Regions:
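Flexible, glycine-rich phosphate/dinucleotide-binding loops
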Residues: 10-13, 43, 77, 102, ...
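Rossmann-like dinucleotide-binding cores of NAD(P)H-dependent redox enzymes
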Residues: 1-42, 131-132, 156-164
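Short coil/loop linkers at secondary-structure junctions
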Residues: 33, 86-88, 150
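Mid-to-C-terminal Rossmann-like scaffold of FAD/NAD(P)H-dependent oxidoreductases
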Residues: 117-189
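FAD-site-proximal beta/loop scaffold in flavoenzymes
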Residues: 46-55, 61-137, 141
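Well-ordered beta-strand scaffold positions
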Residues: 59-60, 167
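Structural motif
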Residues: 56-57, 164
Length: 189
């Protein structure tokens, strides 16, 4: 038996309301139970270290033999604070279309950033694309900028695919998608 416990409805922030709820329904059909515990949980163990249960802060207890935690990603950029490199409020590195970091005290192109830590300009705002395909594309952009200077901008394709619970997702556009998704093949039922 698998139980997913989250502080908010899982997948909705990533996939949007429609696809997030569709995935949760498919998970439920495959025997996965989902619990929302906004105040968090406490993992309780035996003296031996063996997990006994997980208890929500509102008092609900869930028996458990194994606990796997996945708490998302946070930038490890504390060491950049005060360096002049521009960071957003959460600590992500702000870059331009050539993967060059913004900031003060250094020339454009002296500091570059790629991958999950970089905040990219897209459609008039800065966004993260924490996906392996984007990390590879940004690494190539960094290499081009280092070798040739800022000649070719990096424009990621806002696309990804995955499979979960028998559903194949191919998503193009900003994530989470705003509004209802357009179904090109198949249906949402």
């Amino acid at each position: 038996r698998v139980r997913v416990i989250d502080v908010r409805t899982p997948l909705v922030p990533v996939l949007g309301e429609t696809l997030g709820r569709l995935t949760l329904a498919a998970a439920h059909e495959h025997g996965v139970k989902v619990e929302v515990c906004p105040a968090g949980v406490v993992v309780e163990c035996e003296e031996s270290g063996q997990v006994r249960r997980v208890t929500s802060r509102d008092g609900r207890a869930f028996p458990a033999d194994v606990v796997v935690t996945a708490i998302g990603d946070m930038p490890n950029t504390e060491w950049l604070r005060g360096s002049g490199v521009a960071l957003d409020a959460q600590g992500w590195v702000v870059v331009d279309d050539y993967a060059r970091a913004h900031g003060d005290g250094f020339a454009p192109g002296e500091i570059l950033a790629a991958g999950d830590v970089a905040l990219l300009p897209q459609s008039g705002e800065y966004r993260r694309m924490p996906h392996w395909e984007n990390a590879i594309g940004q690494a190539k952009a960094v290499a081009r900028t280092l070798v040739d200077g800022p000649r070719e901008t990096y424009t990621p394709d806002p696309y990804f695919w995955t499979e979960a619970f028998g559903i194949a997702y191919k998503i193009a556009g900003p994530i989470p998608p705003e509004g209802e998704p357009e179904v090109i093949k198949g249906d949402l039922d």
